[in-house]
Amino acid sequence: MKFSVIAAILLFSVFAASAETVYTVDCNGGGDFRTIQECFDALPSKPSEWRTVRIMPGTYREKVTLDVYKDKVRILGDEMAETRIVWGDYAGKVVDGRELTTYDSYTMSVRADEVCLDCLTVENDAGRVGQAVALETRGDRIHLYHCALIGDQDTFFARGYVSRVHVENCHIEGTTDFIFGPSIVLFECSTIHCKAD
């Protein structure tokens, strides 16, 4: 009996020590944050442990950036069709008196290393107006699993020059040059859908 109690205490101690911090984003107000960007801004930089950002179902109409040094993050949606991040910037659009280029037309930019995106959709809904990036990745060791990247021109910009990205069980669609960039990208069991000839 004494051994069982000691074993249980040790097991719980190991589990508690390995438990990661979970942040919840809910656009309906039921989480720690209402917007994804508020959550990303609150993440401590240069972490030693992994964190999870849990995004509840809904459409999050915002432009989001996971900045450099916000490494080791699991960004977990509910389901690909249920958790959607949508924005509509495009090259040539004027925002605050400045004309955007391809490089800042993204809906979501992942600049940190060691990031997992799981079960969500990232969409640029600008339409056929030119370059309009849905997801831009700059960090190294990025893993996309069961995600949808939706757009027209330049949907997925694998921008990092020394970046490795693994795309698994995902759906990517667009019209012109919709997957581009200098990164090393491995596509596995994924659907690439061209919406135009």
Spans of model-derived segments:
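Sec-dependent N-terminal signal peptides
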Residues: 4-15
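Short, T/G/N/S-enriched strand-turn elements that build extracellular solenoid repeat scaffolds
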Residues: 34-45, 61-70, 75, 111, ...
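Right-handed parallel beta-helix
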Residues: 109-197
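Right-handed parallel beta-helix/beta-spiral solenoid domain characteristic of secreted/periplasmic
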Residues: 27-29, 34, 50-52, 71-131
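Loop/turn elements at helix/coil->beta-strand transitions in domains of secreted/extracellular proteins
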Residues: 20, 48-51
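Short active-site-proximal "capping" loops at secondary-structure junctions
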Residues: 58-62, 80
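Active-site-proximal beta-strand/loop segments in catalytic clefts of secreted hydrolases
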Residues: 28, 56-58, 170
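Right-handed parallel beta-helix/beta-solenoid
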Residues: 13-41
